[in-house]
Amino acid sequence: CMNMAEGKVQDLRAVVDRTVKEVKITDVHTHLYPAEFGNMLLWGVDELLNYHYLIAETFRYANVDYDAFWKMTKKEQADLIWKTLFLENSPYSESCRGVLTVLNKLGLDPGSRDLDSYRKYFAGKTMEEYIDIVFETAGMKEVVMTNDPFDDQERPLWEKGVKRDGRFLAALRIDPLLIHWEKTWPRLKSWGYNVEQTLTEGTLAE
């Protein structure tokens, strides 16, 4: 009887493991964009390395001036981050492990520590191809974007009615309305909304 119970537990565990591996997920909070949004989608190993947590970690190790760092090109910044966190020190932080995990999942060799070879991999892919690879590798069905109507780079794309990859779902970012009303209400008014700085009933209704 005990063996039967153990067998059922093992069977259930196998079913759960298989289901988790096979199910397609929806990521409900991302800062990703479809290829139709052009340079708003940050991709490639240099962008991967220029993650703000990795930048902060680099400043703790590297003897580099803050202003000098931000005057570097993206490639130069990535070179410094890679050298500091992955070559001169053991990449043991969660952020560093995330980079190594991505490289491994893409079929690249993290152990080679060869940044140029990783760059060649991305250079050989189009943005659309890489998006497909990420969705397939991560088992994603769709992702929810974070869309800011007050972003002057993003808003014109929506106003143009750009056709986008259906796997990218829109979600309106309203932080500026709640936190920076003194700056956002004049913009809303210039776009034709009947609003005032004072939160009148009419403004709230609009």
Task: Kindly label every feature range from the protein language model.
Residues 2-26, 30-206:
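Metal-cofactor-binding active-site regions of metalloenzymes
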